[in-house]
Amino acid sequence: MERLDKIISNRTGISRKDAKAAISAGKVTVSGKIIRSSDFKVGENDEIFLGCNKISGNAHIYIVLNKPKGYVSATEDPEQKTVIELVPPEFFRNGIFPAGRLDKDTTGLMIITDDGDFAHRILAPRKHVPKKYAVTIDLPVTDEMEAGFENGIELSDGICKSAKLLKTGDFTCEVTLSEGRYHQIKRMFGCFGAKVTELHRLSMGGFSLPEDLLPGECRELTNEELALIESKVNE
């Protein structure tokens, strides 16, 4: 069991001093009761609210974000907006970070967490967790591209693992990768003289971006969804 002020500070990013002040002011409830004691011990199943915002009670937090354009995949940046800025107070914790990167102009599924072990399991190259993207290019999608992706395209940093390209329109397709090199999809299409104009991540492992999650919105992942993300590890 942990002190109430410590939990609030760790899971919201506010200082311990401000956490104590909020508790003393009666702004914090634990399982429906106003608690004014900073050293109150919080149980594993207790629900904590700071004002109207619920504070997650799990040991770690796992967030799915529908990343919009214009945000960089970083915890902080002095000149650009980061994906962490999209996380609302009820989900924020000290130490959260984006598990993997999406370019500033790339949209779609992103996982934010404070669990380094989980991030390693889904991102390590040897785990081969598949990631699917919807892609739009400025040239027609060809059979040559499909064959090239399947056979493995040679880039400046080596030959890519086999990737699946499924044509969905004259200029659109879905690409599934099991690795994550720098600007990989853009570079792969560049080998055919094509430029990627839109890139949107649809899924990781067996988990797809929820259709009702609008750009810029996020929510906590359920245990079932976490299991789906890891369901294809090492396949």
Residue ranges and their predicted role:
Residues 1-235:
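Basic, flexible Lys/Arg- and Gly-enriched helix-loop patches that mediate nucleic-acid binding at interfaces
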